[in-house]
């Protein structure tokens, strides 16, 4: 099920029009199209819902543990005002993480990529969707649980 704020989704991406200034990004022609792309991509995670919070669109949902089936992680993906030029912020709202957890930034934000990686394997405004970030968060959770069990963070650092 796709969510479109208003109008219909164009078949091709219109030119970016964020410079219009006052309107939230999702109310511009490009933004409506991009929100359709984002919503369609998030259909891969049916437990996530899009809501409006504090002037931003936010996806909220749970990811389940792969190593401990009863463990659940409440995750939010918040679009910034200048999306897609700025990356959405991912936060693992619960559970709380112990101090010293590797690859965890302030406010329970997992380090999913290094900005210096750019389009190679980091955030790319043209290709990265909220769905991409949720999938990367699931990988981060798996690495976190592996680190808890073994004391070693698997794979390379973000």
Question: What name fits each language-model region?
Answer:
Residues 75-77:
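Hydrophobic/aromatic beta-strand elements that line small-molecule binding cavities or substrate pockets
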Residues 1-73, 82-158:
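UBC/E2-like fold recognition across ubiquitin and ubiquitin-like conjugation systems
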């Amino acid at each position: 099920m796709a969510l479109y704020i208003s109008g219909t989704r164009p078949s091709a991406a219109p030119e970016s029009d964020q410079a219009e200034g006052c309107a939230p990004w999702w109310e511009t022609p490009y933004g409506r199209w991009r929100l359709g792309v984002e919503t369609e991509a998030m259909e891969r995670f049916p437990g996530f819902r899009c809501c409006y919070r504090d002037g931003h669109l936010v996806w909220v949902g749970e990811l389940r543990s792969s190593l401990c089936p009863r463990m659940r992680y409440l995750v939010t993906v918040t679009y910034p005002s200048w999306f897609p030029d700025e990356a959405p912020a991912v936060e693992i709202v619960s559970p709380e993480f112990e101090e010293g957890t590797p690859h965890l930034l302030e406010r329970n934000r997992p380090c999913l990529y290094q900005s210096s990686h750019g389009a190679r394997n980091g955030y790319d405004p043209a290709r990265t969707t909220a769905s991409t970030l949720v999938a990367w968060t699931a990988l981060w959770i798996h690495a976190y649980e592996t680190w808890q069990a073994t004391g070693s963070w698997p794979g390379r650092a973000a």
